[in-house]
C-alpha cells in the first residue's frame, strides 16, 4: 500500500539540510494513528476523490444555479445560487414517499446491475490516481438518515420515528440492503482505499434525533455498511456530518468511522480530541458559516485557521472548512484556507 516510508518521497530543503517528506497519504495515516506527521493534513489534499460510476451517471445531481432535476430515487433536487448545496423540493407534488405505512408503493431502489463494460471508464479514472500519494476515495451521498428525509420530507421523517417506528425500520433496512449492494460493486470495480460518506445528523446545535434513537435506528445499519467496506480493502472511512454530533461520537467509533469530517466548533472539538482522539480523528473546526460568506477576507480566513490549529493541536486533527467537499460557496475561500493552513503548519511543525 502507500504507507511504505521511503516510497515516492520528495525532497524538502526548507528546514536546512535534506530530509524525507511523507507523502500526503502517509502524513494522513500518521495523523490519525497518533504517529509523527511532519505537517498538517491540509483539508482534502490526501483524497483522490471519485464521484462517477454507472449508478451516479444515471442519477442526475443538482447543479449550482441550474433548474431542478429528478434523481434515480425519484427525488427532485435543486441547488439555488448562494446556498452551500443541493436539497430536495418537498411540496406535496414532489414528496416521493407520501405515506410511510405504504412505503413499498412509493420507494423503488435504482438498479445496480451494470455490466463490466459500463464500469470500465470509471475503473480507468480510479487507475489514474497515484495510490502512493493519495487515497482513492469513493464519494457516497446521501446517507441513510438523509435518504429517509429526502424521500419523505424532514418533518414527516422525524415524526415517523415516533409514530411509525416499525415502518421506519423497514425503510431503513431496505435502504441499507441497497447500500450494501452498492458497496459490493464499488469494492469490486473501483477498489477504493477510502470512502467519503455523507450523512448529516444534526443542526449546528443539536442532533436531529436522540442518541438512543440513533443507536436503535442507524447504528446496526452503519456497522454493516462500514464493516463491509473495511472487510473489502477500504483502509479509511471518512464520514461527513457538518453539524453538532458530539453525542454520537461513541457510535461513530463503534460503526468504524476513522475520520469525522465537518466537525463544527459547537462540538467542543478540543474536548472530543482529548477523550476520543486515539479512536477517531476530527476533520473540520473551521465553520463554513464563519469564513465562507460574501464579506470574507484573507485576514478573516487566516485568523480562523490559526485559532483552530492552536486550539485543536496536531494529533487526531485535520484543519478543514466544514463544507462537505473541497469547494466553497464564495470563490477563493477554500484556496485561501489551504494557503493559511500551509502557513500555520510551517510554524507549528518545526
Language-model-derived ranges and their functions:
Residues 33-35, 40-80:
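N-terminal accessory/capping or targeting/presequence segment of soluble
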Residues 49, 84-86, 144-145:
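Short, acidic Gly/Pro/Ser/Thr-rich loop/turn segments
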Residues 4, 8, 13-16, 20-45, ...:
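Active-site loop segments of alpha/beta catalytic cores
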Residues 54-57, 81-85, 89-92, 149-150, ...:
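Short aromatic-enriched loop/helix-cap "lid" or pocket-rim segments at secondary-structure transitions
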Residues 67-118, 129-137:
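A contiguous, low-structure linker/loop signature
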Residues 46-48, 59, 95-97, 155, ...:
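Short, charged/polar low-complexity linear motifs in solvent-exposed/disordered segments
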Amino acid at each position: 500500500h502507500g504507507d511504505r516510508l521511503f516510497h515516492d518521497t520528495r525532497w524538502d530543503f526548507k528546514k536546512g539540510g535534506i530530509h524525507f517528506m511523507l507523502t500526503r497519504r502517509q502524513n494522513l495515516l500518521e495523523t490519525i494513528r497518533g504517529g509523527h506527521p511532519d505537517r498538517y493534513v491540509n483539508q482534502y489534499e490526501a483524497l483522490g476523490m471519485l464521484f462517477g460510476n454507472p449508478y451516479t451517471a444515471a442519477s442526475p445531481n443538482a447543479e449550482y444555479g441550474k433548474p431542478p432535476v429528478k434523481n434515480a430515487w425519484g427525488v427532485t433536487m435543486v441547488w439555488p445560487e448562494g446556498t452551500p448545496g443541493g436539497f430536495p423540493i418537498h411540496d406535496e407534488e414532489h414528496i416521493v414517499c407520501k405515506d410511510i405505512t405504504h412505503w413499498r408503493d412509493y420507494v423503488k431502489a435504482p438498479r445496480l446491475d451494470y455490466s463490466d463494460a459500463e464500469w470500465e471508464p470509471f475503473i480507468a479514472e480510479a487507475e489514474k490516481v497515484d495510490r502512493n500519494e493519495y487515497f482513492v476515495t469513493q464519494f457516497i451521498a446521501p446517507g441513510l438518515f438523509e435518504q429517509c428525509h429526502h424521500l419523505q420530507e424532514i418533518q414527516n421523517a422525524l415524526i415517523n420515528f415516533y409514530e411509525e417506528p416499525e415502518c421506519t425500520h423497514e425503510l431503513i433496512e431496505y435502504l441499507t440492503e441497497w447500500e450494501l449492494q452498492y458497496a459490493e460493486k464499488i469494492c469490486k470495480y473501483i477498489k477504493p482505499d477510502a470512502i467519503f460518506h455523507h450523512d448529516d445528523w444534526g443542526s449546528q446545535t443539536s442532533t436531529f434525533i436522540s442518541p438512543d434513537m440513533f443507536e436503535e435506528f442507524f447504528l446496526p445499519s452503519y456497522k454493516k455498511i462500514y464493516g463491509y467496506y473495511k472487510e473489502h480493502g477500504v483502509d479509511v472511512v471518512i464520514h461527513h456530518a457538518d453539524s453538532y454530533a458530539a453525542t454520537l461520537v461513541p457510535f461513530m467509533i463503534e460503526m468504524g468511522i476513522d475520520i469525522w469530517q465537518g466537525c463544527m466548533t459547537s462540538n467542543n472539538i478540543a474536548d472530543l480530541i482529548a477523550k476520543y482522539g486515539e479512536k477517531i480523528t476530527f476533520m473540520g473546526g473551521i465553520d463554513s458559516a464563519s469564513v465562507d460568506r460574501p464579506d470574507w477576507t484573507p485576514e478573516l480566513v487566516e485568523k480562523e485557521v490559526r485559532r483552530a490549529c492552536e486550539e485543536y493541536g496536531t494529533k487526531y486533527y485535520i484543519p478543514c472548512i466544514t463544507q462537505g467537499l473541497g469547494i466553497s460557496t464564495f470563490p477563493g475561500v477554500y484556496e485561501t484556507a489551504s494557503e493559511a493552513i500551509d502557513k500555520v503548519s510551517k510554524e507549528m511543525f518545526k
